[in-house]
From Swiss-Prot:
Gene Ontology molecular function, alphabetical: ATP binding; ATP hydrolysis activity; ATP-dependent DNA damage sensor activity; damaged DNA binding; single-stranded DNA binding
Binding site for ATP: 68-75
Listed transmembrane segments: none
Name of the protein this chain belongs to: Protein RecA
InterPro entries, A to Z: AAA+_ATPase, DNA_recomb/repair_RecA, DNA_recomb/repair_RecA_CS, P-loop_NTPase, RecA-like_C, RecA-like_N, RecA_ATP-bd, RecA_C_sf
Subcellular localization, as worded in the UniProt entry: Cytoplasm
CDD domains the record matches: RecA (cd00983)
Secretion signal span: none
Keywords: ATP-binding, Cytoplasm, DNA damage, DNA recombination, DNA repair, DNA-binding, Nucleotide-binding, SOS response
Lineage of source species: Bacteria, Bacillati, Actinomycetota, Actinomycetes, Mycobacteriales
Entry function: Can catalyze the hydrolysis of ATP in the presence of single-stranded DNA, the ATP-dependent uptake of single-stranded DNA by duplex DNA, and the ATP-dependent hybridization of homologous single-stranded DNAs. It interacts with LexA causing its activation and leading to its autocatalytic cleavage.
UniProt family annotation: Belongs to the RecA family.
GO cellular component terms, semicolon-separated: cytosol
Record organism: Rhodococcus jostii (strain RHA1)
Amino acid sequence: MAPQAHDRDKALDLALAQIDKNFGKGSVMRLGEGVRQPIAVIPTGSIALDVALGIGGLPRGRVVEIYGPESSGKTTVALHAVANAQAAGGIAAFIDAEHALDPDYAQKLGVDTDALLVSQPDTGEQALEIADMLIRSGALDILVVDSVAALVPRAEIEGEMGDSHVGLQARLMSQALRKMTGALSNSGTTAIFINQLREKIGVMFGSPETTTGGKALKFYSSVRLDVRRIETLKDGTDAVGNRTRVKVVKNKVAPPFKQAEFDILYGLGISKEGSLIDMGVEHGFIRKSGSWYTYEGDQLGQGKENARKFLLENTDIRDEIEKKIKEKLGIGADVTAATDDAAPVEF
């Protein structure tokens, strides 16, 4: 047995040497050889969602799918991720296939609209080709495609109304994702695909809901987020926002099926302060007695809205609560580029 093992080791060494010669050093390596770096992430803007994702945000160099019903907060979640990437000095691009991006709203969420790269392509092929070229440049930190449903194949645009184009969009997405995934990993770019829901006809058992663009995106996505509006927030009789639930239905970088709930306020986006209050109460840092919220003996306010306003005005207390929650849960976000000499940025 020993001579055979020696021969196998020798044959493997020869094969590895030949591979290194043909394809460059490091083309094949043993998994335990290098020091494994923690997965770099981009925060989502909601501490509850960062915790549900298990690593503190959306993973870099991966495909992320955000889907849900209309007006559930899909684009808002994506824009908050863009704002956080830009805040750390990153470059962001937005492929607006729906031609519906509101620059004023994006600005209110913290997006640097002057620096944001925007494309409003005519066809699905053009949109995905632009996305692929931007990713391969290696300069991008985050790219958002809004939405997959709006990526209309050229043949469909040039054809007549009523023409059948079965499977064109699915084939387009499958080809694009095959090309993109390797480039995403090499460049450390996070690609967010926003998707819409459709209903399958004739489904008797199970959910009839499905997403557009075929099955390729489901397979290539490292993270899939199901965004749902569960409640309307009111100030008296006026609707001021939505209570949103996000379920992590797929997660390749941490345990899946966790849920997060947070408030999205109209015109303001995800309420960071609201998320901190919810998480603070859950983990015992903030005490709720009746309708009053207190932190270390100091009253934050009566009712969640007053407590939110207090934290908005007193950023030092807000930052202190956030730090304690993140320390307890062991999450911290590194949104820097995936390079050896880059210093990590702690959030």
